[in-house]
Amino acid sequence: MHERHIGPSQEEIDHMLGFLGYKSLDDLMNAALPNGVQSPPDIKIPSHDELTCLTQLAAYAKMNRIKTSMLGQGFYNCITPAVIRRNILENPSWYTSYTPYQPEISQGRLEMLINFQTMICDLTGLEIANASMLDEASCAAEAMLLAKRVSRSSSNKYLVHNGVFPHIRRVLETRADAVGVEIVDLPEGQSIDFDHFGVYAQYQSASGKLLDLRHLFSRSKRAGAICVIGCDLLMLTLFTSPGELGADIAFGSAQRFGIPMNFGGPLASFLAARKAMERSLPGRLVGVSVDADSNHAYRLTLQTREQHIRREKATSNICTATVLMAIAAVAFAQHHGPKGLRAIAHRINTVAVGFARLLKQTAFRVSSLDIFDTIEINNPTQLCVEAESKHDLLFWKVDDNKLRITFDEVTARLDGDLPERLSKVFGISPDKIRDLGCNYDSCDCSFYSDSQQAREGLSSVASRNISVHSDLARHPLRRFSGYLKHPVFNNYTGEVALMRYLKALSDKDFALDRGMIPLGSCTMKLNAAFQLEPVLWPEFANLHPFAPRGDADGTLQIIDQIETWLANLSGYDAVSLQPTAGSQGELAGLLAIRGYYKSLNLDRDVCLIPASAHGTNAASAVLAGMRVVVVACDQQGNIDLDDLRLKASKNAHALAALMVTYPSTHGVYEDNISEVCSVVHKYGGQVYVDGANSNALIGYLRTGDFGGDVSHLNLHKTFGIPHGGGGPGIGPVVAKAHLAPFLPFRNRVHKPSTDLPAVKHMGGPIASSDYGFAGALYISWAYIFCLGSQGMKRCTAVAVLVANYIAKQLSDTFPVLYTGKNNLVAHEFIMDFREVTRVSGITVDDVCKRLIDYGFHAPTMSFPVPGTLMVEPTESEPFSEIQRFIKTIRSIRAEIDRVIDKTYDPDNNPLKRAPHTLEQIASDKWDRPYSRRTGIVYTSGKYWPASARIDNAYGDRNIFCTCPDLPD
């Protein structure tokens, strides 16, 4: 199957090898790889064709048993509209794009993200929201840390209401322990007579009861504390917004806005806050700026908060978020509009409250009728067993005397035989159950608005002979404030309008369906369409993460296989798939190291990090409770061994870990990597190998063989999961046996390696569900299953070949900053523009914008060295695209030379004025000393950027992060 995945043909591969002076791919790899590093054992994973792969996945899907889930707990059945499934989730224009660091070629997804931020701000009643987080539980931890940063209190106590979901509570405990925060349980009604920096409660508690938190928040604010609320977006269409309740921070999951449960994700969570907190907010933030033509344009704003700039001082370690799912979620809101969302929520609430009343009439003890969607029943929970075994219904068992039932968009429809099955469990007439839906249908939802007329109309609404409806109309938390009034949420409820809107936005963006994205350290390779197909199969997509394990046999077999494959391919003994991004894999690995030392009663908290490391490394170390000590790099870009020895010996009694990326972020295989690991081990530390660059290793080198103790792998880089415009990703953590017990899990015996006894993972959880974003694992499983071990090995070699071919072809155009053994690079290389900038005034930013005119996404800019571009072409690009890139860089060099020899004006030339838009070219006015054709570099199928060059400084000075008003 590698023939489909690998871009160049065998003849083209031979041509590139000949140009470099090698006879075979293995000859090239042997010349590039370090001496003295153990070769991996022969791992035999056979390759398969697409049909065999899909047939096998279909067999696994049939092994899953999809029952009617009424489990709730933050994961809900929902309906993914076909227009969203087809035009977003299955559309490579959306799922193959990268994080929008180059805003001129990202206006489509940036617009959808600012729509998402606006939606969150409107529904939460808060002024600022970011462009998605990861899972809900890790988002809860980020909300806690944000509260700690901005609180006036010096306390380390964080009050957590006892009504929060248990899985969120457990993640909070894991994250709080690492940074010295004390979680204090807050039973309902308990007085607060001690200092605390924050308080967190769930608006609808886990029991289903709606909590009026105004009094609690008022008391906490008087103590200088920050008030945090966990909330449900659908519920907020009916009930008072968190901002109006006094919350300072609100977070939650957008999963029920059309995103399947998929055994835990992927999904998008959200975080909103008061405007004063905008510079402390974690994650990405989209803002409005202006371009060179004074048009509104979107960009990522306030990036100085983030890990790639602030490193250990960043507000969070989050890099990849969940952009694709956030875009799908806001499209769901646009598809339904505010009235449609209210109708869905109203039906759920009507059915849930009505069913609770029926239960009470049948002598069941219901904890509260003051609910949105969840009913708690105080009765022996033998009902759970009977409901599951006899009627395929899943209820949440709290304890031996209590269960919970949650209604959602699907179950509230009361379709099919659901009323009959509920009737058999609870002894209620199925006709009465079915009538609950009829009561909903007779209700008018139009009174949910912020108008005075709505307030005055309460009495007439309440006087109707519909008791459930009356309860909602009279509810003290009933929402009066408006939301989603912007035309973008009201103009696209028709499918034609939404389809055209999404098409227009995707046309503004540059993704892999348009051309090469040679971003260094990002591995923008093929995401094969057939590998993505199974993600939305109902047998996978509709599986609740807390369903009985017997219902997930097929998915669990896939998980077991992929764990075994990843452990064997990387040279480790154990795997946790729980981390929902590479940043979370880093955190999980460092927490495992921390847990290991704590088990030995050793207080080790120093983390050595090379100066060249990615910013997430330092940010993750801080979140794991470690102190960062920077290790210098030498002139060749390698870790300075002398400085490493000095720092390791100086911190010998406190040394916990070294974080090192391999191949290095400078794009070379460091020859002394084994010695680097030995130095750290000598002084009692562990070696964390960042697996971001594993696309240069698979089949040839295993990080666990040269001294790594723990690593993470980026499945959205090396193993075929698409980047989605900024997520979702998966960052599994792999570890040696001595660290395996400290990986995140929930006390499940875990045995991915056939050579070792089973181990129990005792590390605290870091994500909402055991397997993180399990729904995307099918993609990586298919990638490995189809390519096999030899196919993946060939992918590695071709990736290295293409990088070296381009580097050598361009070495006379721009210097290659670092090379390794035999003057070779790994899978990426750094082009140095610093001298050119000095003599011409043309910066790497100018070059990146000019590349847009030529139809390329820019390489990684000014990382890890300012004034450089890091190029990673991957193995998937056709040889014709490789040649086009080489030709383009040479053309740009020729343009720079015209600036140097003063043929071009130094401030008014095709590079300084790039990118060139269609609007500019079509304008009657052309005030530039070069021709229109020179500016646009016209080719067949040309990509036109949606905006001219965007003013970054303006965007950071004028923070505006919601939908701007439409022009007249």
UniProtKB/Swiss-Prot annotation:
Keywords: Oxidoreductase, Pyridoxal phosphate. Pfam families: Aminotran_5 (PF00266), GcvP2_C (PF21478), GDC-P (PF02347). It is an enzyme of class 1 (oxidoreductase). Its EC number is 1.4.4.2. It comes from the Bacteria. GO terms for cellular component: cytosol; glycine cleavage complex. Its cofactor is pyridoxal 5'-phosphate. GO terms for biological process: glycine decarboxylation via glycine cleavage system. SUPFAM superfamilies: PLP-dependent transferases. The modification N6-(pyridoxal phosphate)lysine is found at K717. Disulfide bonds: none annotated. Signal peptide: none annotated. GO terms for molecular function: glycine binding; glycine dehydrogenase (decarboxylating) activity; pyridoxal phosphate binding. It catalyses: N(6)-[(R)-lipoyl]-L-lysyl-[glycine-cleavage complex H protein] + glycine + H(+) = N(6)-[(R)-S(8)-aminomethyldihydrolipoyl]-L-lysyl-[glycine-cleavage complex H protein] + CO2. Belongs to the GcvP family. The glycine cleavage system catalyzes the degradation of glycine. The P protein binds the alpha-amino group of glycine through its pyridoxal phosphate cofactor; CO(2) is released and the remaining methylamine moiety is then transferred to the lipoamide cofactor of the H protein. HAMAP family: GcvP. The glycine cleavage system is composed of four proteins: P, T, L and H. This is Glycine dehydrogenase (decarboxylating). It comes from Tropheryma whipplei (strain Twist) (Whipple's bacillus). The gene is gcvP.
